[in-house]
């Protein structure tokens, strides 16, 4: 499964995109109409926050989470600051999509909800 892109759809119609391959643009063309709820995508160090924001928008995903935290930790890069900038860019563009940088080795529950304020 190395270097492969695919989408998993749960029984509840929740779509998870796993984008690890190099043909990202072609992959986007195939899954854009599916509008994944969650995009898991490796974040290459040379990607500017604008590039990652573009990828989220190209995919049409609601939430994006990075893969491969080890590269950032090895270089002491602050991925929280990086993804804060990605979210600022998405917000400026009027996108409702957001990137989330999970804490390594911590479990999360991911859901899409509407809650009253």
Regions found by a protein language model. Give the residues of each.
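Binuclear metal-ion centers of metallo-dependent hydrolases, dominated by the metallo-beta-lactamase
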Residues: 57-117
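Active-site environment of divalent metal-dependent phosphoester hydrolases
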Residues: 23-27, 45-50, 67-80
